[in-house]
């Protein structure tokens, strides 16, 4: 299944480098790639000389349930915008395919080690690019793509908070083994470097939410280390990584970062606007409690619930849980709760 693993790596890399695959052309390539990769797996499975057992990961079931709910919204016209729900459903189907293929392609410890190394190296490269672009920024993504809708970019993302979210997802791949003492002595330096650069990039992005989430991650890891009684010399390794990351940020210009951290708040959604969006989204849920307004339809249904108009389009609530309830109802909320519970227990 090596070609399938390579295909998954390529899709992950493309999704990140294409600004999160949020534009129609990028979504189309991602969806087509997932479909072709599924076809490749099916052909190899059918003509395989040895018998392969198909694995259904536990996370697949709540995702499938949510997909079926969205299909029902579309089929029975329980959606405010059939076009939008269909688009989001196509993306969800692509994610289901990738989750299924990952379960088939990554089975052995060697497979997962390869995945971990890919994530660490890719995160290092993306973070390094983000730092370089930050230091030489000319107002364009990749130095040539204009920002159509404004924003505060970092790395390949048009929104620095999205970059911080990406780093939050991949940083544990290098940081956790260091803190838990799962890295061989001869690899400590390279794994440490693979953690320092993404960590430095996260701090440089000046994403308040990202830095707060990082603090929460570190607190959780500290608790795990205490419970497992693995603190001590392993804590020193983690401390060195954090210290070097802070020194890197200081060397690159801490004053610039602090001013950016405080001065760009006016370019983001204000706290009053966030509170207004949460309130409006909650009212949408109360008016459509069972099935919601349709997957991905918040932008279409939100205007009548607007209480703090500022001339800008609200396409997301900045609260995923509330938005899920508003667009998929109680049934969708139960699917999300099922997914989270499975994630923590599997």
Feature annotation, model-predicted:
Residues 159, 275-314, 321-335:
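TM-adjacent membrane-interface loops and short helices in multi-pass inner/ER membrane proteins
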Residues 330-346:
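Hydrophobic transmembrane alpha-helices and their immediate junctions
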Residues 21, 77-93, 149-164, 270, ...:
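Short aromatic-rich membrane-water interface segments that cap or initiate transmembrane helices
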Residues 67-74, 111-146, 158, 199-205:
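Hydrophobic alpha-helical transmembrane segments
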Residues 12-15, 194-206:
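Membrane-interface alpha helices of multi-pass inner-membrane proteins
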Residues 26, 109, 128-137, 144, ...:
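A membrane-periplasm/extracellular boundary helix in multi-pass inner-membrane enzymes
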Residues 1-121, 176-193, 219-243, 269, ...:
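Transmembrane signal-anchor hairpin modules in multi-pass inner-membrane enzymes, especially those
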Residues 126, 139-177, 206-209, 319-324:
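Membrane-interface segments at transmembrane-helix junctions in multi-pass inner-membrane proteins
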């Amino acid at each position: 299944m090596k070609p399938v693993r390579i295909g998954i790596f390529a899709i992950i890399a493309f999704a990140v480098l294409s600004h999160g695959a949020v534009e129609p052309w990028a979504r189309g390539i991602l969806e087509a790639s997932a479909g072709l990769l599924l076809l490749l797996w099916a052909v190899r499975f059918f003509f395989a000389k040895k018998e392969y057992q198909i694995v259904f990961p536990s996370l697949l079931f709540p995702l499938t349930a949510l997909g079926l709910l969205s299909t029902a919204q579309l089929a029975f016209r329980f959606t405010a915008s059939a076009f939008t729900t269909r688009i989001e459903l196509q993306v969800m189907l692509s994610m289901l395919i990738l989750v299924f293929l990952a379960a088939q392609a990554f089975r052995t410890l060697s497979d997962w080690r390869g995945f971990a190394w890919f994530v660490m190296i890719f995160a290092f490269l993306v973070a390094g690019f983000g730092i370089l672009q930050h230091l030489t920024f000319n107002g364009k993504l990749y130095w040539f793509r204009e920002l159509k809708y404004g924003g505060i970019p970092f790395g390949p993302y048009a929104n620095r908070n999205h970059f911080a979210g990406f780093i939050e997802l991949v940083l544990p791949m290098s940081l956790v083994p260091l803190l838990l003492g799962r890295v061989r002595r001869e690899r400590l330096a390279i794994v440490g470097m693979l953690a320092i650069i993404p960590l430095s990039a996260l701090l440089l992005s000046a994403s308040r939410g990202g830095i707060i989430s990082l603090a929460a991650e570190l607190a959780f890891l500290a608790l795990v280390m205490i419970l497992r009684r693995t603190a001590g010399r392993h804590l020193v390794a983690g401390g060195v990584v954090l210290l070097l990351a802070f020194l890197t940020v200081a060397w690159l210009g801490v004053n610039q970062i602090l001013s950016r951290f405080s001065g760009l708040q006016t370019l983001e959604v204000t706290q009053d606007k966030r509170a207004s969006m949460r309130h409006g989204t909650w009212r949408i849920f109360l008016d459509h409690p069972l099935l919601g307004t349709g997957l991905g339809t918040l932008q279409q249904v939100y205007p009548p619930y607007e209480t703090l108009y500022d001339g800008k389009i609200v396409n997301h609530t900045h609260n995923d849980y509330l938005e899920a309830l508003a667009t998929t109802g109680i049934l969708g909320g139960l699917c999300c709760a099922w997914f989270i519970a499975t994630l923590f227990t599997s």
